[in-house]
A protein has these predicted regions:
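Pyridoxal 5′-phosphate
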Residues: 1-371
Length: 371
């Protein structure tokens, strides 16, 4: 967590520890502070305060979006487990992508039958950093929506995107993106964990997941997470205020790492979309190398990397995302995800790149891999 975020949160852990739904003056002050934080979050994405639904994180936001509609859900094979599992549980349609992580717009158009109520496509892939053209997808959805209206089809059609990985890297303006629902997560921008939001465009009616006191426009009942909301707003403000300069800095760091690895690791495969990729993520594969062993060896030497998303890696599963991109099992098993952030320096990249090469060379030399 960014220290500035923690500083903003601290008063609400102690002196301002009031229930914002209460009627007394101190509680009303906290309620007003939450309202200001909600306004700040809304302003960053070009929305209205009433369109911001605070949740306990991206997974809850995604479940609210996907389970909140009546009808079929269409998504892609490279989505986060929270999207795929929810869509499949509802009998949803899962579309393939090409090797660059892009959805085929004609396939999408064909998949959106009159029974479909929601299309959910991630903005930035969590494992590879590949960026989807959300605006182009929105245009397809709008075209089908217009066609339904002309034919008298009453079922609404919405577009949802999980933009958790896009904060501080890409434009999040909901009007320019053309989306109806958007998931964001405080923990992905140096804010507190277990707090997120779902943007719900005005006029959209969702079924609530949690019923009770009617907080969050009736969609997410329960006493508000005051510290989380305050911290989330501060984290988003910081991320957006430095977005331009940070993208340039991260791009330079990613290029530095990529250049060194390509020069020193024979047969390395960079899993990226060169035209549309987040500067904060570099994913690469080395066939014949066990990715998990590389992660453990690097961790012992002070370098923290991953084999994929934390959720999948924790289960010891092969990345469904890399398999969907067309990688072989050997390439997927030999994949490493390196993320760069606000506190990463060029010196960090120099040291990490040398250690990555060292560990992979050792594995190849001694054949250290699972049978």
């Amino acid at each position: 967590m960014d220290q500035r975020v923690l500083t903003a949160m601290m008063p609400y852990f102690s002196d301002e520890f009031y229930n914002p739904s209460a009627a007394y003056l101190a509680a009303r002050r906290v309620h007003d502070d939450i309202a200001m934080a909600r306004h700040s979050l809304a302003k960053i994405i070009g929305a209205k305060s009433a369109e911001i639904i605070i949740t306990a994180g991206a997974t809850e936001s995604i479940n609210l979006a996907l389970n909140g509609v009546d009808g079929t859900v269409v998504t892609t094979a490279i989505e986060h487990d929270s999207v795929l599992a929810t869509a499949r549980a509802r009998g949803g349609v899962v579309l393939s992508v090409n090797s660059l992580g892009q959805i085929d717009l004609e396939s999408l158009r064909s998949a959106i039958t009159d029974q479909v109520a929601l299309v959910s496509v991630g903005y930035v892939n969590s494992e590879t950093g590949m960026i989807q053209d959300i605006r182009a997808i929105a245009d397809v959805v709008q075209g089908i929506r217009d066609d339904r209206r002309q034919r008298g089809v009453e079922r609404p059609l919405y577009l949802h995107t999980d933009a958790s990985q896009a904060v501080g890297v890409l434009d999040l303006n909901v009007s320019r993106l053309g989306i109806d629902l958007m998931t964001l997560n405080a923990g992905k921008c140096y804010g507190p964990k277990q707090v997120g939001l779902l943007y719900v465009r005005a006029g959209i009616r969702l079924k609530p997941l949690i019923i009770g006191g009617g907080q969050e426009m009736g969609l997410r009942s329960g006493t508000e997470n005051v510290t989380g909301i305050i911290g989330f707003a501060k984290a988003m403000e910081l991320a957006e205020s430095t977005r331009g300069s940070e993208v340039k800095r991260l791009t330079a760091l990613r290029n530095q790492l990529k250049s060194y690895l390509v020069q020193h690791i024979p047969d390395i495969k960079i899993n990226e979309n060169q035209r549309r990729n987040s500067p904060a993520v570099l994913n690469f594969s080395v066939a014949g190398v066990d990715g998990e062993r590389v992660v453990f060896a690097l961790d012992e030497r002070g370098v923290q990397v991953a084999t994929g998303s934390a959720c999948a890696a924790n289960k010891g599963l092969r990345s469904h995302i890399l398999v969907a991109l067309g990688l072989s099992n050997a390439e997927a098993d030999g994949s490493i995800r390196v993320s760069m952030g606000r506190f990463t320096t060029s010196e960090d990249i120099e040291a990490a790149s040398q250690l990555i090469v060292e560990v992979i060379s050792e594995q190849r030399k001694f054949g250290v891999m699972d049978a």
